[in-house]
């Protein structure tokens, strides 16, 4: 959350877009409680949060113990070895993210993103040992 606020502060045009989205959702009664329907309508705010977690993942790397031998680029890595996966590096891979060093929340609103490999964006890890608090 802190990185999202920081990035929105750096990019006032994105901050204004979030404000317009919230103004539209709460235009009839700005003092009311937030509902689940309201949260579902906050598409741009969600994209801003996801993009912040892409650039600054809450879990920068994860470790996994191999349960079987695997071969990568002709090298066999034996069962029992702990492999470390850099989520920070994965999220900045140009193969999956155009201009990976830039804060572009809109990338999460496109079909291009939804058609990407499911494990190219894993801010809370992935698989059976992922974070139970992810959204």
Q: What kind of feature is each model-predicted range?
A:
Residues 1-13, 19-21, 135:
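Cytochrome P450 catalytic-core helices
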Residues 2, 19, 23, 49-57:
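Amphipathic, well-packed alpha-helical segments that form the structural scaffold of globular domains
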Residues 11-15, 59, 92-96, 127-130:
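A structure-centric feature marking long, well-folded core domains of fungal metabolic enzymes
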Residues 33-75:
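Conserved cytochrome P450 K-helix E-x-x-R motif and the immediately C-terminal K′/meander segment
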Residues 85-113:
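Conserved cytochrome P450 K-helix/beta-meander segment immediately N-terminal to the heme-binding cysteine loop
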Residues 111-135:
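Cytochrome P450 heme-thiolate "Cys pocket" and heme-binding signature region
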């Amino acid at each position: 959350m802190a990185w999202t606020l920081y990035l929105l502060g750096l990019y006032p045009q994105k901050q204004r877009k979030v404000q317009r989205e919230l103004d539209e959702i709460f235009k009839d009664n700005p003092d009311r409680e937030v509902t689940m329907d309201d949260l579902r309508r906050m598409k741009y705010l969600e994209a801003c949060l996801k993009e912040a977690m892409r650039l600054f993942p809450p879990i920068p790397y994860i470790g996994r113990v191999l349960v079987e031998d695997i071969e990568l680029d002709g090298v066999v890595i034996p069962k029992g070895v702990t492999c470390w996966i850099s989520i920070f590096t994965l999220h900045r891979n140009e193969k999956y993210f155009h201009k990976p060093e830039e804060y572009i929340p809109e990338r999460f609103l496109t079909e291009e993103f939804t058609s990407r490999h499911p494990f190219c964006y894993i801010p809370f890890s992935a698989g059976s040992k992922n974070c139970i608090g992810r959204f």
